[in-house]
Amino acid sequence: MANLKEIRDRIVSVKNTRKITEAMRLVAAAKVRRAQEQVLRSRPFADRLARVLQNIQSRMQFETADAPLLKSRDVRTITLLAVTGDRGLCGGYNTNIIKRTEQRYNELKRQGFTPDLVLIGRKAIGYFQNRSSQYKIRAFFQDLEQVPTSKDAESVTSEILAEFLSKSTDRIEVIYTKFISLVSCNPVVQTLLPLDPQGIAEEDDEMFRLTTKNSRLVVEKDAAPSNEQPKLPSDVVFEQSPDQLLNALLPLYLQNQLLRALQESAASELASRMTAMNNASDNAKELAKTLNLTYNKARQAAITQEILEVVGGSSS
């Protein structure tokens, strides 16, 4: 059995670690709320832009539009845009995206396509660069804002737009983590280019509020405030041709779609980190209890041994 000093030192170490994980959990919880609010703040613009595109759609056939971002072509090269984080300590968040990207990459190769990668986040960059003989990397981005902004989305959008318009890639898919709740986030694959803005619809958002109950953090679910925008009047007259409008608005629509993916990924990363730190804190608490029990047993055994030695010495 370990001596008392070693056990006591380990108890102190575990308690200090728990303080750190608790602090990280609280920081992640606060940032999750901010990330959710960021998504909602970008919603009115996204809704209005989608309705304008729907209005244009109702007046023309997109198949006949002279809009390169809408035109499908024979697919040979497919670019996968993988979104991970720059840091760890967030459970399986980064690992799940990397595994899904590998799965999709190999699936496309088996189907006869030529896949390549655009990577966002240090975790994906480090992983795939170490396996550069197996995976072709087209570009990468790192050190984005913790809560992604339109500037972050614009830099990535410019890169993938240039690749698509130059026909160096025929389709672009984004692999990101869809934020469902604080305890549920799923990796999803979504086609970014060519665009298909028909049937645009957004799912209802939910806000998660952190409160305290019995001295512990608990999660309460709130309905997100509605950002529904009025429909455009049917008698609106566009001064420019529909083709000109589409070519001006579709890059904005693409950027907004990418921004939404980045924001959901950021919220998912923070939620995963909060959950991981919560589990770590609980494990540290249980380990401290076990060590305290071990310490008390060892201390009791040492005292008993001393008593026996004293009794034995007096008897002799």
Swiss-Prot record:
Keywords: ATP synthesis, CF(1), Hydrogen ion transport, Ion transport, Membrane, Thylakoid, Transport. It is a peripheral membrane protein. The keyword Hydrolase does not apply. GO terms for cellular component: plasma membrane-derived thylakoid membrane; proton-transporting ATP synthase complex. It is found in: Cellular thylakoid membrane. It comes from the Bacteria. Transmembrane segments: none annotated. GO terms for molecular function: ATP binding; proton-transporting ATP synthase activity, rotational mechanism. F-type ATPases have 2 components, CF(1) - the catalytic core - and CF(0) - the membrane proton channel. CF(1) has five subunits: alpha(3), beta(3), gamma(1), delta(1), epsilon(1). CF(0) has three main subunits: a, b and c. Produces ATP from ADP in the presence of a proton gradient across the membrane. The gamma chain is believed to be important in regulating ATPase activity and the flow of protons through the CF(0) complex. Belongs to the ATPase gamma chain family. This is ATP synthase gamma chain. It comes from Prochlorococcus marinus (strain MIT 9211). The gene is atpG.
